[in-house]
């Protein structure tokens, strides 16, 4: 139940009545709502998901073996891996992170599927990687195997989606609004959010 939506709708109807606006005459419009999140590169996204899962086990003392993965709990580790290791090819660093993800999941043996951090890690791997003919997991090739617009953009806001409009990239949501209109003015009487996944071509 969205209590905020119910409250806004109720107040809007009362305002429309007070202004003498005929609620039977309505018009609809849509707008894009930008999510308050960073636009992550693929290596940043994968790192963030692995780090969150490792930190979950470290912070909750689950007993999962984190040997070799301890560095993900260091607050400075992300900057070191992502920004201060440019002498190491980004594909090599990304492959290492993917391998770390598989190591962690293998050690967990499917026991933590109910944990949000694990759900996001599994989703990220499914959307950003594929298993090659040799049985090895690798990053999807841009263009040929690009993730869908509905893919995870940032683990801090899992529902935010991607679209390209007017030559610009947007990460967030689409809002559909219903406006009651009359000679005395107008007021928004209802709204809803949906995934912002359609480009200009759609």
Predicted segments — roles?
Residues 1-202:
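Polybasic low-complexity intrinsically disordered regions
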């Amino acid at each position: 139940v969205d209590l905020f939506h119910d409250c806004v709708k109720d107040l809007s109807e009362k305002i429309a009545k007070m202004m003498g606006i005929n609620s039977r005459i309505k018009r609809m419009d849509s707008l894009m709502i930008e999510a308050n999140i960073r636009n992550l590169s693929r290596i940043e996204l994968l790192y963030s998901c692995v780090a969150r899962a490792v930190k979950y086990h470290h912070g909750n003392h689950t007993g999962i073996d984190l040997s070799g993965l301890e560095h993900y709990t260091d607050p400075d580790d992300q900057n070191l891996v992502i920004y201060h290791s440019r002498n190491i090819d980004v594909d090599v660093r990304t492959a290492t992170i993917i391998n770390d993800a598989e190591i962690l999941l293998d050690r967990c043996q499917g026991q933590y599927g109910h944990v949000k951090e694990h759900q996001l890690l599994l989703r990220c791997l499914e959307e950003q990687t594929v298993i090659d003919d040799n049985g090895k997991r690798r990053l999807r090739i841009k263009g040929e195997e690009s993730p869908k617009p509905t893919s995870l953009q940032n683990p801090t806001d899992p529902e935010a989606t991607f679209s390209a409009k007017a030559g610009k990239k947007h990460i967030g949501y689409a809002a559909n609004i219903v406006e009651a209109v009359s000679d005395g003015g107008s007021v928004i009487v209802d709204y809803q959010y949906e995934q912002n996944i359609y480009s200009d071509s759609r």
